[in-house]
Amino acid sequence: MDRKTFLRTTVAGAAALVAAPGALVSCASPKEKKQPSVPLRLSFQEGVTPGETLAEKLDFMEKLGIVGFEPGGKGLAGRVQEIREALQGRDIQVSAICAGFDGFILAEDPAVKAQFDTSMREIVRAAGELGSTGVIMVPVFNWQNPALPHTLETRDYLCQQMHDLGEFALSCGTTVILEPLNRKEAFYLRLVGDAAAICRDAGSAGVKCMGDFWHMQEETSDYAAFMAAGPYLQHVHIASRGNRVMPGEDGDKDCYTDGFRALKELGYPNYVSFECGCRSDDRAATLTAAVDLLRKQWDEA
């Protein structure tokens, strides 16, 4: 293997080559690039928000100044009109779409892969109709078998598949967003920098990646993860650091300023979306406190 190929396919090479020049400077002197004017755009997944109906959920979000709504992808094509009408006249937009497809992209079984191709494209079309920033996808979970082996050939295959999917997403006015997971959930894609390298090598502006504060804490620092993503960063998930509940419910563990500082330095334009449970019986009060905590830490970052 020559040096160029080695750098292209290693974690170190991915992190080094993905970062834009400005990002590399920021990593060397992280306090010099603060951009406090960058707004914190918070989003809630549909299941996070209290309320019996979609209208009630959105009413609650509006009261807190939440500007993003992240629905699931399952059945999304049949909900486009419902969601459009519910958002009409509100200062809330659809952020990302949380998966919801059948099958998986790295399936060995052609029938399972075909399920992914069909269902994912249906969700991507609906995402485009809703003006979503993209559809989140994981290449393969630990429990999904049989899957293609973790080899250079599989990586090349994934890059080609992502290119095709990214181009389709662009034609629909949206993107596809690779999500790295922690090692307990995924063997294949675990670092934000690795996901960004695949975005780069896929060669399509429709292929992006995301970072999740819950998953990132096991793999690298929040700051380094986001800076490695650079211009490919399209979405962010957030939860408490100990038990994946609401930010603040795990006390002093729930510090996000390191990651927020990176998002500011990057001029990150998209959403930080709640993907978490709730320990408290009073979900509304806990969400309100969580939003206050994140806004405070954003100002401090």
Where in the sequence are the language-model features?
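Active-site acidic/histidine proton-transfer and metal-coordination neighborhood
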Residues: 10-21, 31-36, 106-208, 284
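Histidine-acidic metal/acid-base catalytic patches
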Residues: 2-22, 27-43, 53-65, 131-133, ...
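Anion (oxyanion) recognition and catalysis
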Residues: 62, 88, 128, 170, ...
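Residues that cap or flank secondary-structure elements
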Residues: 48-50, 74-75, 115, 157, ...
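Structural motif corresponding to the early beta-alpha repeats
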Residues: 67, 71-166, 244-246, 256, ...
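A cross-domain feature marking catalytic cores of carbohydrate-active enzymes
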Residues: 42-48, 71-75, 96-101, 137-139, ...
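Surface-exposed charge patches
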Residues: 59, 84-85, 125, 167, ...
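Generic anion/oxyanion-binding catalytic loop in active/binding sites
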Residues: 46, 50, 58, 105, ...
